[in-house]
Design a protein with these regions (language model features):
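N-terminal secretory signal peptides that target proteins for export/translocation
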Residues: 1-6
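Extracytoplasmic "Venus flytrap"
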Residues: 41-55, 78-81, 164-171
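A ligand-binding cleft/hinge motif common to bilobed small-molecule-binding domains
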Residues: 105-117, 173, 177-182, 205, ...
Length: 352
């Protein structure tokens, strides 16, 4: 039987660099590579939104936990619901561990749903991890003028309720459209916003009635004061197994699903937020550098200085290890094609 060539540093990578006896030497190789270099993290959304803020805070501490202590900078690359950044990391960025990307897990899964513009395979990225294991929700600003407080209220609204989104590939579009098609809710999605911050500002200005894709972590850091003031109401949350305190008495959508098949289709759409802000390296990045970066993301998020900064800004981090993130993306591809097609139909924008 032909065996692949043995690479000591790849073996050490699988042992988290140091557990294997040759790991120290590999760690030295990683340190030698990164010393004096700069790592760029591309964020697939505009400045000031949840993706941007949480990534920048993380980046401030990330470099000191990477062997060689490289400088880490963040660059915004919005476009097509973060697909522009996803394509860049897959096809354009150098495959050496100096360019990473943070983009939506929903965007990463667009090839599964047949999006021809999504010219990448999420199973081939080197997943470094995810900054959050999150649950999403939808919020309504001042009851949309109809006193909407729950998902049943939204479903039965007499006047069309509008939600804002960056693009059809984003959960700000997919989540409300799932509600529309699953429950026949009277709602519409308005596109063209550059980022989640722009969607939220439009909601507060009254251009639209609500916003979906509201992560548990973002609600605490950016919107808690509006909820307490009675201006904004979380009307539905998408966690399957737990309720989120910050979401108050919001309807749990899964409780309204009637069949196992409906729940499996919902899992395909809403379990993605367990990888709320995934961090990826290009396919082909050397394994020892991937292992070092995977260790560094976990070390960064438990760094006392990072924890203090996060608490000050009311940002919650609940990281997902890179190996687990990779396994989750692979699992999505094991979904039966008929259920994938249902999920695609439920999240398709209405014809213009």
């Amino acid at each position: 039987m032909n065996r692949p060539p043995f690479h000591p540093c790849a073996a050490a990578a699988l042992a988290a660099l140091l557990a294997w006896p040759g790991g120290a030497a590999c760690a030295d190789q990683v340190a030698d590579f990164y010393a004096g270099k700069e790592i760029t993290i591309l964020v697939g959304y505009g400045a000031g939104g949840g993706y941007d803020v949480t990534t920048r805070l993380f980046a401030n501490h990330f470099g000191k936990h990477i062997p060689g202590h490289p400088t880490v900078v963040v660059q915004n690359m919005p476009g097509a619901g973060s697909m522009k950044a996803a394509i860049n990391i897959y096809s354009v960025a150098p495959k050496d561990g100096t360019t990473l990307g943070v983009f939506a897990s929903s965007t990463a899964l667009e090839p599964l749903f047949g999006n021809k513009a999504a010219t990448y395979d999420p199973r081939k990225y080197e997943w470094i991890g995810s900054l959050h294991r999150d649950i999403a929700s939808c919020a309504i600003w001042k009851g949309a003028g109809q006193g909407i407080k729950t998902l049943p209220d939204l479903i039965s609204a007499k006047k069309t309720v509008t939600f804002g989104s960056t693009s059809p590939t984003a959960i700000t579009s997919q989540h409300p459209l799932f509600l529309k098609h699953m429950f026949n809710a009277n709602l519409k999605v308005v596109y063209g916003y550059k980022g989640t911050k722009d969607v939220s500002l439009a909601m507060m200005r009254g251009e639209i009635d609500g916003s979906c894709g509201m992560f548990e972590s973002s609600v605490r850091s950016a919107y808690e004061q509006h909820i307490k003031a009675g201006e904004m109401k979380i009307v539905v949350q998408f966690g399957r197994d737990r309720k989120v305190p910050y979401f108050g008495d919001a309807t749990q959508m899964y409780a309204m699903l009637q069949t196992d098949e409906q729940k499996r289709v919902a899992d395909l759409i809403f379990r993605q937020t367990e990888l709320a802000r995934p961090l990826a390296a290009p396919p082909g990045t050397p394994k020892e550098r991937v292992a070092a970066l995977r260790k560094a993301i976990l070390d960064t998020i438990k760094d006392p200085a990072m924890v203090a900064d996060a608490e000050r800004l009311k940002i919650d981090y609940d990281p997902v290890p890179g190996e687990e993130a990779a396994a989750m993306f692979a699992d999505f591809y094991k979904t039966p094609p008929a259920l994938v097609e249902q999920g695609r139909k439920y999240t398709q924008p209405d014809p213009k």
